[in-house]
């Protein structure tokens, strides 16, 4: 018989840097999960993605065990890295802060494809271009 999921926790944690401090500790402490065990497993799983914030979905079962699934980094983080900027524009419609190529958008779309609501790379590129536009990043051909 399958274990019953008691709680699902969604967090965004820097890759390889999970520790019992907030936000990880309080979120998992409420679910009575072994926090050091989660931190070590998460850090081991994400050590090759250092520098990115990784979304994670943690399923907590009634016997206090857990499983977690990591997702790809947020599109905004990938776009900021590609454009070599710290943050997007405060007024994206009038102020453009950077320019990236369509090839860079395609690389990001290929990376994000499993987590996007799209079945082909062309549609995924449109989603990423929309995110870039909202951040004040110009996409050139």
Curated annotation (Swiss-Prot):
The keyword RNA-binding applies. This is Large ribosomal subunit protein uL11. The keyword Disulfide bond does not apply. PROSITE patterns: RIBOSOMAL_L11 (PS00359). GO terms for cellular component: cytosolic large ribosomal subunit. SMART domains: RL11. The lineage of its organism: Bacteria, Bacillati, Mycoplasmatota, Mollicutes, Acholeplasmatales. GO terms for biological process: translation. One or more lysine residues are methylated. Keywords: Methylation, Ribonucleoprotein, Ribosomal protein, RNA-binding, rRNA-binding. The gene is rplK. Belongs to the universal ribosomal protein uL11 family. Part of the ribosomal stalk of the 50S ribosomal subunit. Interacts with L10 and the large rRNA to form the base of the stalk. L10 forms an elongated spine to which L12 dimers bind in a sequential fashion forming a multimeric L10(L12)X complex. Forms part of the ribosomal stalk which helps the ribosome interact with GTP-bound translation factors. It comes from the Bacteria. GO terms for molecular function: large ribosomal subunit rRNA binding; structural constituent of ribosome.
